[in-house]
């Protein structure tokens, strides 16, 4: 791992779709990815449950549990070089660890939100936009999926 000793999350939320509307809540321990997956599995909803986590204004993680299936997405695979939580994420997702000379690219399941209306090309374009910080990328995802108002309320509370 690199020299990043302290990892701060800008925010970490879980969202689930039930009875035609989204509900969201803050995640208490965003570095404990196994616990997050267990929490998402407890949300037995028709649209599954999603965790969105931003780390140090550098990258974001997305985890989606739908039934027994778990999908993973990271906005920049090279962050696993410096961030232990990203390296653990890649291990859970069964993705190869990056090399020092790898390009900063998204990795994982680009179709993680396709059935909810956010297609892989749009997600990839969001991640490629150098003008957007990870929290802004997550806000765009929330807007596209339909829970931007709930996210704004949660972040302002």
What kind of feature is each model-predicted range?
Residues 12-14, 52, 89:
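Generic structural hydrophobic/aromatic packing signal, biased to beta-strands
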Residues 6-19:
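Non-catalytic, solvent-exposed interaction/assembly segments
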Residues 82-157:
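Charged, compositionally biased boundary regions
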Residues 11-14, 36, 114-115:
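Short amphipathic alpha-helical segments, especially helix-boundary/capping motifs
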Residues 17-19, 39, 100:
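Aromatic-enriched hydrophobic runs in primary sequence
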Residues 2-4, 21-85:
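Compact, well-ordered interaction domains used in eukaryotic information-processing assemblies
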């Amino acid at each position: 791992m690199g020299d990043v000793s302290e990892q701060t999350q800008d925010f970490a939320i879980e969202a689930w779709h039930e009875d035609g509307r989204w509900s969201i809540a803050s995640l208490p321990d965003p570095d404990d990815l196994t616990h997050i997956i267990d929490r998402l599995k407890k949300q037995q909803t028709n649209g599954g449950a999603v965790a969105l986590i931003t780390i140090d204004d550098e990258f974001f993680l997305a985890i989606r549990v739908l039934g027994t299936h778990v999908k993973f997405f990271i906005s920049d695979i090279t962050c696993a070089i410096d961030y232990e939580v990203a390296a653990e994420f890649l291990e859970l997702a069964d993705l190869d660890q990056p090399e020092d000379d790898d390009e900063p690219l998204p990795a994982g399941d680009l179709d993680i939100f396709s059935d909810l209306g956010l297609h892989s090309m749009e997600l990839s374009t969001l991640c490629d936009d150098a003008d957007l910080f990870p929290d802004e990328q997550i806000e765009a995802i929330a807007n596209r999926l339909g829970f931007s108002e709930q996210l704004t309320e949660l972040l302002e509370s």
